[in-house]
């Protein structure tokens, strides 16, 4: 214990954030030096009295015999103590704040996954809400840092903690809280370094959540911009993160450009192939029934990942392809009845009403995916002689 305390004092006195983050790690797998001993005894050995409550809270958080709820409370108390001392510290303290907030969220996430009892799970959720307020306090300390030197300012931790809060809020299913945090940061962006100057690991997470939130708000164009940015910022070896980004970007990219992933993408990310390939193949064939079956098989995933709305929007493209096949089968006739479309839908095993088909055609016309108009008296779609299906004609 004496060696451990001596190392703690050295890291605190020399303001060595990375070393202190290692010494105050609350994961025994990454910090075998953390002593399972009396918290007060360890804290009493810290020469800087301001740090004594931090060290005491750290030792208490390392207690493996506590329940998941108690562990979460202890880790929250540890971060709260770090926030207290961070008020008068500069950029050097960020590594330990990063580590503490990440582990706090990890404790909560694992508890939610492992606990089956509904009442116990609700207690964890309530505690996580409290934890999110502590992390929000950490973000506020970064945003409001008035250090005269920007290089030594805690502002460099801003986007990391925005990402941490978004992860917590999504875990709690409170996406509006994520939007509120992002609005606050955007309103203060003039006082922050440019986004591009932050570590890519921070901006990648930020861009990803901006993209997901845009998609949930049905702003597909903004979703494409942010998710593409996140993919470009993602570390090339972080294939799991790339896969998560692409899980959202693939439907967005199709909605915006009609593009589907290349063979190389499918080979690199076989799980994405499992999720999307059957669905996209059916879409490109105009096979409504197979498309619906593929979506139904993955419905729980799409709902969980906030993708269901985007996938439902893709269904319009299946009918567009089906209508195009009818157009070609009729030698590119400029007049096609709604009954013809309904008969084609029945051929692929889908029973839809004439009203639904008219609404689908109207939607295609509105979005410039079909050139023409509907003659409602004759229940006929009148197509332009040239370029009736501009997107599909171009692709062909």
From Swiss-Prot:
This protein's encoding gene: CSN12
GO MF, any single term: double-stranded DNA binding
Family: Belongs to the CSN12 family.
PCI domain: residues covered: 204-388
Matches recorded under Pfam families: PCI (PF01399)
Name this polypeptide is given: Protein CSN12 homolog
